From Swiss-Prot:
GO molecular function, one term: ATP hydrolysis activity
One of the protein's GO biological processes: double-strand break repair via homologous recombination
CDD domains: SF1_C_UvrD (cd18807)
Catalytic reaction(s) noted: Couples ATP hydrolysis with the unwinding of duplex DNA by translocating in the 3'-5' direction; ATP + H2O = ADP + phosphate + H(+)
Lineage top rank: taxon: Bacteria
Protein EC: 3.1.-.-, 5.6.2.4
Family stated for the protein in its record: Belongs to the helicase family. AddA subfamily.
Record carries keyword Coiled coil: no
Name the record gives this protein: ATP-dependent helicase/nuclease subunit A
Cofactor(s) demanded: Mg(2+)
Physiological role: The heterodimer acts as both an ATP-dependent DNA helicase and an ATP-dependent, dual-direction single-stranded exonuclease. Recognizes the chi site generating a DNA molecule suitable for the initiation of homologous recombination. The AddA nuclease domain is required for chi fragment generation; this subunit has the helicase and 3' -> 5' nuclease activities.
Signal peptide span: none
Annotated UvrD-like helicase ATP-binding domain residues: 12-485
């Protein structure tokens, strides 16, 4: 019971609600954790409290903790491990805590898919799957689906008298392809798999269309649409009532009042009918008759008021007319005929989906593979059993898990789907009032509905649970935000109190949902939130809508670039919490958030033009990259050289290097036949003298092509790719171009993709090319390879979805004027979890099609869900900001938009009217009307408070609201007047005019001599490695060293060498592993393999480097005395960079300059450990020792000491200077032979 829970300790930093979430027990608990409320810390503390509970401790492996991502699971484990280690410091003798640390790696702290995998691995014998199954990648899954579906449709086309199938084809395919039918089958398959019982859900789709013996009132679609009818009639009535108020003004058109009152009565009649039945509304709609307005002399009244009255009345009439046309132009029974007619066709469609699912599952089973939805359904199959009445009950295995888990904790619960919810239900106790399920999330941040997440699960429990937990589950609100300044939180609250409600938005943004200040910040300057609305330029855009979008992106990018540059240049300050002080803002403190990434390239370009470093992880553009495009054409030619366009592209590319004239010459040798045939014929003959160079180029390429084609038939695709890179030299070539590193990274990604493809059950170049073509046909793409680290000092551009869980000092939210993406609502067919299937009624014989009731209902439902999702996306965007929030949107006609937005000022309630919120087409349609009711918009509007209540008008938030003229952003910067004369002289190539008083200064500069000429022959900045080389006699001079750095002519690139990695590359790989190996985990082969695989995924290692790592040598180090000291040390620092000033004569043996000269030395220390008696420095070496020295290690030791003595002495000196502590020991560790060398002075 509540009174038995531990009291919050004195001086605790936990809030009361946080503490309640940490200690509450005895029932299912739902924690609604607002953005920045410290939910992860609460979750970890709850787990720790359970583990170290004195009265009833729980082993960590008796907890199931479900996270949304693998990264979150790992972070959770790390935090729990750190917390347990702190407990161990206070209780060093606690065997229980030591046991928990050893159990932590085996604990069930993972994603739901990892838990499902664990269950399946344990009980695979209950399923018809190979226990050696593997997880299919997306590539393989798509290819399998395509193959299965092609086979099924081919069979159906071959069946005689397959009448219903061909009717389905006639209705839902074009005369060119059956792609739409394929899309329908795949979409139904995917949607069905988001339900615990897919077949049951599919059967319900068909049942809904069986309307025999039913009336329209029995249909769920009609019931839902009646609610929408009431909503629209209410909107119309509000327009009329507002018009009536205006007509009653002293200068209003009073003669209109009588007509308006009749309008209210008419709408009241329609609303009453809507509360009765569909048939009643239909009949009432047939009798709608609007009275004619009485003529008035407009000069007798305020003309603007008359226009407003007439406009509002027309809006009301339009609402009714829309209902009449969409819903009530047809008799109710005609809608029923649509359903009856479509029923057999839908039945056939569902049958095809079931056959597809069965065949697809069988093919995966034969190939020993499963996908992620299989993991969920297989797990559910193990944990459930079906009763006689068809209900799903927990199986014996589920009951075992219920007994095992003392508590199940689910993070990001708002993103759970129906199948995952069922799995969780089967491993937790039945009763919510006595349950052991702890759920944490924020439904306001549920933004993954497109991945079939179901926020309704969270909302249902939030409404059902109480804060006291009486008679059911308990809910706890964590509303305090420890991330952001007051200005960010108050600004966000002000907007969402007005736009987010249950009817429109699915969530009541009430006092419990509001963000509350939890963080403390010093006073800051210019911290008010901002809305910058850009008025688009009036110039005609020649490229239509696409051109207008580009211009909007450019305008917003220029405005953001100006603001970022101004803030950085002016030293705008942000708070550094680590140092508890203000500091100048850096580029990495800025983020630009977008709903989607199409604008990102334009924004990047504009920022770069302003000299602002910027990075965006683009998910497009990979196949458009020139180097990738050329290589894909090479592979197309290898697969089939008879393709003219790919072959011409390769011949024209830098690989072969033909000019346009040479290409034309080749074509002239044979006007008929393919390019390949012409090339073959040309090479058989003797070339003319002027064609010898062309002949040589083509002969070189032709011979290579024949070799590649032969190689492709016998060897792997990935080996073919490296062979092409090597024999063409193209990989090296692109490395020398601008952005060479990026280009080479793109080519490496192509190789990696090929390796991943070959890891599937598919093989061969043809299938690989076909798959890539399917990707391009679908409009998909991959992002270019990442060539930038996450800690770089750059402005980041990312989607709002990618930003979830992150925070930034300064946040720009751009593109707020872009329309919501409603393409899904325009599809030929619609699917919904509750309403099933909806499409137009299509009659191919009569060649007619029209909207059906199911389509209208699903479209309306999806529109309202889209509106709710977009609200949540906006909430996520606004809550990423820590200190400064800047909102930017562009509109075509600011005055027109403002007139629309000003309607909100007439409403006195906090929540804006439903029709304003539901009618929004972009984020600005919510933000601007909200802010126009605040006093800070008065500088722009100059309208006064009017009828806006004080609590809204004077709400405690600070905003800057501004309309920016787009012309000022696109105007070129004015050239300074004093530069005009200079520019004119440069244009005409005349002598530059020089003022007489500056002639002497110019002369002095030209004749000046450097006073430290001796220092010019030695570099002022050296690495420790370079200094070490200077001390080796054979390389004592800089000139010799520089000579050594020069690359020999025609150096063979690595991918051409048979021997694989160089010694230096192997050493780099080993150092990377030693830097990242997790010292908190047991050092075993399995753990190291897992960590190395993770480094490959993060692009910290390549596949080749990973394969070269000798794991047993890494383990040998940690088994050595020195390695054990590392594991037991008080602290361990790895890859420690340093810079220090050093007297020049200490670095250069041949120094002849001034004695006071210094140089800057830089280096990286491999490992530094702090023990009780001091600091030990360790440098890892991968030099070859064994077999290189006849006298063995004893002979090698003095040579190695001499070779590395200077290096380690400099490392030690750097550490002693920075730490103010002596280094007690300097060690070299050689992996070859497991040798340790101590360096003595």
């Amino acid at each position: 019971m509540i009174e038995n829970w531990p009291k919050k300790p004195e001086g605790s930093q936990w809030t009361d609600d946080q503490w309640k979430a940490v200690v509450a027990n005895g029932r299912d608990i739902l924690v609604a954790a607002a953005a920045g409320s410290g939910k992860t810390a609460v979750l970890v503390e709850r787990i720790i409290k359970k583990i170290i509970n004195e009265e009833n401790p729980v082993d960590v492996d008796r907890l199931l903790v479900v996270t949304f991502t693998n990264a979150a699971a790992q972070e959770m484990k790390n935090r729990i491990g750190e917390a347990l280690e702190k407990v161990l410091i206070d209780e060093p003798g606690s065997q229980h805590v030591r046991k928990q640390l050893s159990l932590l790696n085996k604990a069930s702290i993972s994603t739901i898919h990892s838990f499902c995998l664990q269950v399946i691995r344990g009980y695979y014998y209950m399923l018809d799957v190979d226990p050696r199954f593997r997880i299919a990648n997306q590539t393989e899954n798509e290819l399998l689906k395509e193959e299965v579906l092609d086979d099924i449709l081919e069979e159906e086309y071959g069946i005689e008298d397959n009448t219903i199938f061909f009717e389905l084809v006639d209705r839902y395919t074009s005369d060119r392809s059956d792609d739409d039918l394929q899309r329908m089958i795949l979409a139904l398959h995917t949607e069905s798999r988001a339900h615990p019982n897919p077949e049951k859900w599919l059967d319900k789709l068909v049942e809904a269309y069986d309307v025999e013996g039913k009336t329209i009132e029995d249909l769920v679609y009609a019931s839902y649409l009646l609610e929408d009818v009431k909503f629209q009639l209410e909107t119309a009535e509000q327009h009329i009532r507002k018009a009536t108020e205006l007509a009653m003004l002293p200068d209003g058109p009073a003669p209109r009042i009588e007509t308006l009152q009749a309008d209210v009565a008419l709408l009241g009649t329609l609303s009453s009918a809507a509360r009765e039945s569909w048939t009643s509304v239909y009949e009432a709609m047939q009798n709608v008759s609007w009275q004619t307005l009485k003529r008035i002399k407009k000069s007798d009244y305020n003309e603007d008021v008359v226009k407003q009255v007439d406009s509002l009345r027309n809006k009301a009439k339009d609402e009714v007319k829309k209902l009449q046309e969409e819903l009530f132009s047809r008799k109710p029974e005609s809608f029923l005929r649509d359903f009856q007619d479509m029923h057999p066709v839908l039945e056939k469609l569902v049958q095809l989906v079931k056959v597809f699912t069965e065949r697809f599952q069988a093919m995966k089973r034969d190939k020993g593979m499963v996908d992620f939805t299989d993991l969920e359904h297989f797990c559910l199959q193990i944990l459930s059993e079906q009763s006689e009445n068809g209900e799903m009950n927990p199986s014996a295995v589920a009951l075992q898990y219920r007994n095992k888990f003392a508590e199940v904790l689910v993070d990001e619960y708002q993103d759970t789907n129906f199948v995952q919810e069922s799995i969780i239900k089967f491993v937790t106790k039945d009763s919510e009032s006595e349950g052991n399920l702890f759920m944490v999330g924020d439904v306001k941040q549920s933004i993954y509905r497109f991945r079939l997440a179901e926020p309704g699960l969270f909302l249902g429990k939030y409404k059902r649970f109480t804060q006291e937990g009486l008679g059911g589950g308990m809910k706890i609100d964590l509303a305090k935000n420890f991330r952001s300044r007051h200005e960010v939180l108050a600004g966000t609250n002000f907007i969402f109190k007005q736009i987010m409600g249950e009817e429109v938005g699915e969530i009541d943004y009430d006092a419990d949902a509001e963000l509350k200040l939890g963080a403390t910040y010093p006073e800051g300057e210019d911290v008010a939130a901002e809305l910058l609305c850009i008025q688009q330029t009036e110039e005609e855009v020649i490229d239509g809508e696409e051109g207008a979008e580009v211009e909007k992106a450019q305008l917003e990018a220029r405005l953001m670039a100006q603001r970022i540059k101004a803030m950085v240049d002016s030293g705008y300050e942000v708070y550094d919490r680590k140092n508890d002080s203000m500091r100048p803002v850096q580029y990495r403190d800025f983020v630009i958030l977008l709903r989607s990434m199409p604008w990102a390239p334009q924004i990047m370009e504009e920022l770069k033009l302003q000299g602002i470093p910027v990075y965006a992880d683009l998910a497009t553009g990979y196949f458009e990259a020139t180097e990738v495009n050329i290589m894909m054409n090479v592979f197309r030619v290898i697969d089939n050289p008879m393709q003219d366009i790919p072959l011409a592209a390769v011949l024209r590319s830098p690989i072969v290097g033909l000019s346009d004239e040479e290409l034309a010459t080749l074509r002239a040798h044979g006007k008929k036949g393919s390019f390949y045939e012409v090339m073959s014929s040309f090479l058989k003959g003797a070339p003319l003298e002027e064609e010898q160079e062309l002949h040589d180029k083509l002969e070189w390429f032709y011979n290579l092509l024949q070799g590649w084609r032969e190689f492709a038939r016998q060897q792997s695709l990935s080996d073919l790719i490296w062979k092409v890179y090597g024999e063409t030299g193209y990989y090296d070539f692109v490395g020398g171009l601008p952005a060479g590193k990026q280009r080479q990274a793109n080519l490496r990604v192509l190789y990696d993709r090929a390796r991943q493809y070959e890891a599937t059950s598919f093989r061969g170049l043809f299938r690989f090319l076909r798959f890539i073509e399917r990707i391009l046909e679908r409009g998909d793409d991959m992002g270019t390879a990442r060539a930038l680290g996450e800690q770089e000092d750059v402005v980041r551009i990312m989607t709002i979805h990618k930003s979830k869980g992150l925070e930034f000092p300064v946040v720009f939210v751009a593109g707020l004027g872009r329309r919501f993406n409603t393409q899904d609502l325009m599809k030929r067919f619609l699917l919904h979890k509750d309403f099933g299937f909806g499409s137009q009624f299509i009659d191919p014989r009569k060649r007619i099609k029209y909207t059906t009731l199911s389509q209208l209902a699903i479209k309306r439902k999806m529109k309202m869900e889209l509106i709710a999702e977009e609200m949540r996306v906006l909430y996520v965007a606004l809550t990423r900001a820590k200190e400064k929030l800047i909102l930017i949107g562009t509109v075509k006609d600011a005055n027109k938009e403002m007139e629309k937005w000003l309607d909100a000022r007439e409403h006195s309630e906090w929540l804006l009217p439903d029709h304003i919120r539901a009618g929004a087409s972009c984020y600005l349609d919510w933000i601007a009307p909200s802010l126009y009711r605040h006093r800070d918009s008065e500088m722009l509007l100059e309208l006064g408070q009017g009828s806006i209540p004080d609590e809204i008008y004077g709400y405690d938030t600070s905003w800057k609201v501004e309309v920016v003229d787009g012309n000022t952003l696109l105007a070129p910067e004015p050239v300074q007047e004093e530069k005009q004369e200079l520019l004119e002289a440069l244009r005409e190539k005349k002598a530059v005019p020089l003022q007489s008083e500056r002639k002497e200064e110019v002369y002095d500069r030209l004749m000046w001599k450097y006073g430290y000429e001796d220092a010019t022959s030695h570099r002022a900045k050296q690495s420790v490695t370079e200094i070490k080389r200077n001390y080796q006699s054979e390389e004592g001079s800089d000139n010799a060293f520089i000579k050594k750095l020069r690359a020999p002519i025609k150096t063979r690139p690595r991918f051409m060498e048979k021997k694989g990695l160089t010694y230096a590359e192997r050493g780099t790989a080993v150092h990377a592993v030693m830097q990242h190996v997790d010292l908190k985990k047991p050092i075993t082969v399995e753990v190291l393999q897992e960590q190395i695989a993770g480094m490959v995924n993060k692009e910290l290692l390549t596949f080749e480097q990973a394969e070269e790592i000798a794991i047993e040598k890494v383990i040998s180090f940690f088994d050595s005395d020195l390695g054990k000291r590392v594991l037991a040390a008080k602290s361990v620092e790895r890859e420690v960079p340093f810079t220090m000033m050093l007297a020049a004569e200490e670095a250069y043996q041949d120094w002849q300059g001034k004695s006071e000269e210094t140089i800057l030395v830089q280096g990286v220390i491999d490992c530094m450990i702090e023990e009780e008696d001091g600091i030990t420095l360790i440098d890892f070496k991968t030099d070859t020792i064994e077999g290189k020295f006849p006298g063995g290690f004893e002979q090698a030791k003095p040579i190695l000491e001499d070779r590395y003595k200077v290096q380690l002495s400099l490392y030690a000196k750097a550490l002693e200077k920075s730490l103010q502590h002596p280094v007690k020991e300097k060690c070299l560790y050689f992996f070859d032979g497991n040798h340790v060398v101590n360096i003595e002075e």
